[in-house]
């Protein structure tokens, strides 16, 4: 239910409804595309994961939404077309610092003049982002290769410099994310024996438990945050 409420707020912020032409950057497992299609939107969703394409298409078909949802194995830079709304959930953290301007420029070009872009992004303080982007931590080595968590300052500066999009509003989900990580870790530990039968060894299990606990501590302490962030063209701001 919490995940569905999160998705519904993203769709609300993007003004997704009947006839909306929606582009999703980062398919996940297809839930956002399905819920958007249930509102009457026409959805195109992009991912670089063949596994996500296969499972998301299967879930879309099971939901009876194949006529409204197109899932493509494609880089966002090659999306093409024009859209009423673009939504991207925790994608920016994975593409690296040097790709951020191109990411926002591409989205700006894909949006129709009255369109909205809504993203969910994990953030860290700007000084820590600057200090960490040239380091190579264990998380970058084992969990998110080449990834970097942005700061709110970086996001604002890049969108102002490289696009016509401006912030409409932001909403922090930090406390909810910390609790989510606690529950993920709890579920992971309860199923640890099952995971070993799936081929995940003890080294991986300890690393993943540490990653979940480390991340939870980051959100609870305020070192990390997570925002749903809504952008519109300057003339479209309320």
Short names for language-model regions:
Residues 42-47:
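Conserved SAM-binding motif I beta-strand of class I
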Residues 77-87:
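A short acidic, Gly/Pro-enriched loop at the edge of an enzyme's catalytic core
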Residues 56-57:
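Conserved SAM-binding loop
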């Amino acid at each position: 239910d919490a995940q569905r409420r999160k998705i519904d707020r993203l769709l609300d912020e993007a003004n997704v409804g009947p006839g909306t032409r929606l582009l999703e950057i980062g398919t996940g497992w297809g839930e956002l595309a399905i819920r958007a299609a249930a509102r009457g939107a026409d959805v195109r969703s992009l991912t670089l994961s063949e596994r996500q394409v296969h499972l998301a298409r299967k879930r879309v078909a099971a939901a009876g939404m194949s006529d409204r949802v197109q899932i493509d194995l494609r880089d966002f830079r090659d999306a093409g077309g024009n859209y009423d709304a673009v939504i991207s959930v925790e994608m920016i953290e994975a593409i690296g610092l040097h790709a951020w301007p191109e990411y926002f420029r591409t989205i700006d070009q894909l949006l129709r003049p009255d369109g909205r872009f809504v993203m969910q992004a994990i953030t860290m303080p700007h000084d820590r982002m600057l200090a960490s982007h040239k380091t190579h931590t264990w998380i970058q080595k084992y969990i998110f290769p080449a990834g970097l968590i942005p700061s709110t300052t970086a996001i604002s500066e890049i969108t102002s410099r490289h696009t016509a999009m401006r912030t409409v509003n932001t909403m922090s989900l930090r406390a909810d994310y910390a609790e989510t990580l606690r529950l993920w870790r709890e579920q992971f530990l309860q199923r640890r024996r099952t995971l070993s039968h799936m081929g995940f060894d003890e080294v991986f299990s300890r690393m993943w438990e540490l990653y979940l606990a480390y991340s939870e501590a980051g959100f609870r302490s305020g070192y990390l945050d997570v925002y749903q962030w809504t952008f519109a063209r300057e003339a479209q701001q309320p």
